[in-house]
Amino acid sequence: MENILEYNNWEDKLWALYNSIFKDASYTITDGVIFPDKYASTPFKVMIMNREAYDEKSYSLNQDGIAKEIGEGIIPFKDQITLRSHLRQYLSLIHLLSNKGFNEVSEKEVIDFVNQSDNDDLVYYLSNAAYINIKKSDGKKRSVRSDLKEYAKKGIEVLKEQIRFCNPSVILGGDVCYNIIDNLFDWGEELYGGDGYNPVKIYELVIDGKSYPFIDMFHPSRTQNYKDGDEKESMSMYFLELFKAMISVEKTRPGYWSSHMNNKCFETSALK
């Protein structure tokens, strides 16, 4: 209950800031932590950062939206099959890796675990996560990078505050980095895939001197094949690229992911 009260009090301040910046928005879809108590108690905290909420009815991304749907037995993103399927895969993988300490997991074990997951598992994983969009109002069904970047630049303090207060163990960025937020945040070390093309890259995003692991991925709604070297691969197997990337970081920096487990959240804020 204490976590819920802390989060609610902070959220009131956050959206007051947002509304003071985007005064002319025709609608706003608030986002963030879905269940504050569950997020606070989960050892490895995942924040999903996607582009924009283009449909006021399809997206409702915090405890006032998805949480109510889950409580009523409604499947989140029920009309967005690709988004739902890929999020389930990525969150299933991270759940498995964090439970195993990010080592001693075979590719076969990953494939079996991810493929047997279902909508009930998605509900469980989302219930422990945070979900935010770069653009929270007046979205477009077809994203335009210049529009998203302009919006992100204007609302950068809102995004920073959401990350700062939620203190995630990892941020899954759905194609929001290149030419959108890449020049708006400070960045630390490139942990994986920084040289040339790679279907997954891992950086450290820096706010107030604190580093947050940031995974630069394709958007979970993507349906086209992707390149892995000279080969084209189906997005249905893209979760293996995420697996390869996270394990590579762990091998080169033993204990890296474990050092981001059990983060304290809902404590650090720049809002008065």
Question: What do the predicted segments below correspond to?
Answer:
Residues 46, 169-171, 213-214:
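Hydrophobic beta-strand segments of well-ordered beta-sheets in folded domains
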Residues 50, 169-178:
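Glycine-rich anion-binding loop/nest that anchors nucleotide
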